[in-house]
């Protein structure tokens, strides 16, 4: 009984010691442990994995990313297979604990970039399979930890245009190198010369037009198939490339090979022909011919100029330029030579006057052409006969580095030559220097400066009448070395010489202050816009209110005009019919007269005249309402009434009461003429 209990406990301990994920197969073949999780639908690396596992296969699942904790402390793992998943992300130092790992399979995933930290810690890796991914970039230091141990590298079926060739050239232990089915266009010369153990190189189906001869290909036999080839041979596969079959591939044509799968894509007379069936004498190159070059070129001293030289040939020739002194022109801060044959001179000097020679060369030969450059001196502002020779002309090479010219003697840094920094910001600096009156015949000043992290000099030429210069487009937070040189004529040799005025070193401000300034300007402009908007809105509201009030009063006046009675009121005295006295009226009368020829006389014109009585207040409206219909005179009997002002002239008359009939007024005939005479002095009132 005790023995049975002990056996059960032993089985339980052994079962708990071996952790096996669900739906996976775990093989415990001592002393190794293998876990196989193929086609199990995993979305991530199982967490329940024995850390003593030697072989782990997680193929054909749906894992999208791998992290460092997935393989932490698995120091015994030798073989890791993650093929045919959907891995698109590898976290840095994911495999850092796999010190003994020998084979890593990551083929058929979705990797696009390999960085420096992806394979850190794999110091014993021998097989790295990265085929069938979407790789377009591999870091130059991605394979640094296993450069001396890697034996098999597979980069096939990716999107690689360029490969870190320097890294490939240091894989001294590599045996198989597969780079087929990519977009590689160029292979550097001699890149495989140190790969002494290389047995198979596959460059099939790329965009290679030529394969440069390599010392490795000449030392050992090269074959097209691995079957039947000696152990000390190299199997080279380069079919499916658009080969340009000229003299540059003649070395490959002379190799002993059995296959005839490669064809030529160019030149036109060899297109689609089998590479190995073309005779050697047809692998020819055309020497270069210069087809176009610049004519005689004129330039002003200190100004930029450009020289052109175009050449054709097979293969495309390389163009180099030779200066009038017979020196090869290299790319500097003053001169730039381009692959298309152009030569750019940023600052011309009188010493550049002469004949420049362009040399076009390729594998078939070379061709030369000449271009004459004439540099005209700047106009003299003073009489050259009065110039004297400067005892210390200083360096005459305008390409002198700013840092080297800054280490001059203390004499040249005297107070009168000192360059000062007047203003400084994050992206600009204002420098000033005193007038150089002791320099005779100064043509211009040359400013040259560079950053502390960049040795490339920047040149600026300014007139001799200027004593300050604003340097723009600087980088914030950088240290700059700046020197001012005076360009003048040597009175004896008539050559252009330069002498240093002074140098200064400064550090530009950080971008923070500029951001604050921009922010304050931005806030100030915003406040101005807001205040202006408020003023404009207030004016618009005021105009709208005036328009509304005008419209309301206009409608009110129109309605009042429609309701106004058109009548002619005639006032009479209170019982004084014979005298023709008219009582005072409190209403305001607007009387309009129509006269012929501007005359107010005539009975007919007086009878035809009309008057408008406008009622403007409630009191007047009440008085008009009390007038009876008999008081309103017909147009044929209308007479001009007298106003209270006229009646007040007569003390015997009163204008307080004024209602009488037309018959009473007619009886006062003796006074009619007097009344008509007085009516001429009446005035109109418009309300």
Swiss-Prot record:
Residues 287-376 form the Ig-like domain. It holds the Pfam family LRR_8. It comes from Danio rerio. Residues 18-527 are extracellular. Residues 241-287 form the LRRCT domain. Glycans are attached at residues 73, 331, 340, 346, 383, 410, 450. Belongs to the LRFN family. Residues 415-510 form the Fibronectin type-III domain. PROSITE patterns: FN3 (PS50853), IG_LIKE (PS50835), LRR (PS51450). The chain crosses the membrane at residues 528-548. Disulfide bonds join 309-358. It is a single-pass type I membrane protein. The lineage of its organism: Eukaryota, Metazoa, Chordata, Craniata, Vertebrata. This is Leucine-rich repeat and fibronectin type III domain-containing protein 1-like protein. May be involved in the regulation of excitatory synapses. GO terms for cellular component: membrane; synapse. Residues 398-412, 565-576, 657-672 have a biased composition (Polar residues). Residues 384-412, 563-601, 630-687 are annotated as: Disordered. It is found in: Membrane; Synapse. The keyword rRNA-binding does not apply. Residues 1-17 form the signal peptide. The gene is lrfn1l. Keywords: Disulfide bond, Glycoprotein, Immunoglobulin domain, Leucine-rich repeat, Membrane, Repeat, Signal, Synapse, Transmembrane, Transmembrane helix.
């Amino acid at each position: 009984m005790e023995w049975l209990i002990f056996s059960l406990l032993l089985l339980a301990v052994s079962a708990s010691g071996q952790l096996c994920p669900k739906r996976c197969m775990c093989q415990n073949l001592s002393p190794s442990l293998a876990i196989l999780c193929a086609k199990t639908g995993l979305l991530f690396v199982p967490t329940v994995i024995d850390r003593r596992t030697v072989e782990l296969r997680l193929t054909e699942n749906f894992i999208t990313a791998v992290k460092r904790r997935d393989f932490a402390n698995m120091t015994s793992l030798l073989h890791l297979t993650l093929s045919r998943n959907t891995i698109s992300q590898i976290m840095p130092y994911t495999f850092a604990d796999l010190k003994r790992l020998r084979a890593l399979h990551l083929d058929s995933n979705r990797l696009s970039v390999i960085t420096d930290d992806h394979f850190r810690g794999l110091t014993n890796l021998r097989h790295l399979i990265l085929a069938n991914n979407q790789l377009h970039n591999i870091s130059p230091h991605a394979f640094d930890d296993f450069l001396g141990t890697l034996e098999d590298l597979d980069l096939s079926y990716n999107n690689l245009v360029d490969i870190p060739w320097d890294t490939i050239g240091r894989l001294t232990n590599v045996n198989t190198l597969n780079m087929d089915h990519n977009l590689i266009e160029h292979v550097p010369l001699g890149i495989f010369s140190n790969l002494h153990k290389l047995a198979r190189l596959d460059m099939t189906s790329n965009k290679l037009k030529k394969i440069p001869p390599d010392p490795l290909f000449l030392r050992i036999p090269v074959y097209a198939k691995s079957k039947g080839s000696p152990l000390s041979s190299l199997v080279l596969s380069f079919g499916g490339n658009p080969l340009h079959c000229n003299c540059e591939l003649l070395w490959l044509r002379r190799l002993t090979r059995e296959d005839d799968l490669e064809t030529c894509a160019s030149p036109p007379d060899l297109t689609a022909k089998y590479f190995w069936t073309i005779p050697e004498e047809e692998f020819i190159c055309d020497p270069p011919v210069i087809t176009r070059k610049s004519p005689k070129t004129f330039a002003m001293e200190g100004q930029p100029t450009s020289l052109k030289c175009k050449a054709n040939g097979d293969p495309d020739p390389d163009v180099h330029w030779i200066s009038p002194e017979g020196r090869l022109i290299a790319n500097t801060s003053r001169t730039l030579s381009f692959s298309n044959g152009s030569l750019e001179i940023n600052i011309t000097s009188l010493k550049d006057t002469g004949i420049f020679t362009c040399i076009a060369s390729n594998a078939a030969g070379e061709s030369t052409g000449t271009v004459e450059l004439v540099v005209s001196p700047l106009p003299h502002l003073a009489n050259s006969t009065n110039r004297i020779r400067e005892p210390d002309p200083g360096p005459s090479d305008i390409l002198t580095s700013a840092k080297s010219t800054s280490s001059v003697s203390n004499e040249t840094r005297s107070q009168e030559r000192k360059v000062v920094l007047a203003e400084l910001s994050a992206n600009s600096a204002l420098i000033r220097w005193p007038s150089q009156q002791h320099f005779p015949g100064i043509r211009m000043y040359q400013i040259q400066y560079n950053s502390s992290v960049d040795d490339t000099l920047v040149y600026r030429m300014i007139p001799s009448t200027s004593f300050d210069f604003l340097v723009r487009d600087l980088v914030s937070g950088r240290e700059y070395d700046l020197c001012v040189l005076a360009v003048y004529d040597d009175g004896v040799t008539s050559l252009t010489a330069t002498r240093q005025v002074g140098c200064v070193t400064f550090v530009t401000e950080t971008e923070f202050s500029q951001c604050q300034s921009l922010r304050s300007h931005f806030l100030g402009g915003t406040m101005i816009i807001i205040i202006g908007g408020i003023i404009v809105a207030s004016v618009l509201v005021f105009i709208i209110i005036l328009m509304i009030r005008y419209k309301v009063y206009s409608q009110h006046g129109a309605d009042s005009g429609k309701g106004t009675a058109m009548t002619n009121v005639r006032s009479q005295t209170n019982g004084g019919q014979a005298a023709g006295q008219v009582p005072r009226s409190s209403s305001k009368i607007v009387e309009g007269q129509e006269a012929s020829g501007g005359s107010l006389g005539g009975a007919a014109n007086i009878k035809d005249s009309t008057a408008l009585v406008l009622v403007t207040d409630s009191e007047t409206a009440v008085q008009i309402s009390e007038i009876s219909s008999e008081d309103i005179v017909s147009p044929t009997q209308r007479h001009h009434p007298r106003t209270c002002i006229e009646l007040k002239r007569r003390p015997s008359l009163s204008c307080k009461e004024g209602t009488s009939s037309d018959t009473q007024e007619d009886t006062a005939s003796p006074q009619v003429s007097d009344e008509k005479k007085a009516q001429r002095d009446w005035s109109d009132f418009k309300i």
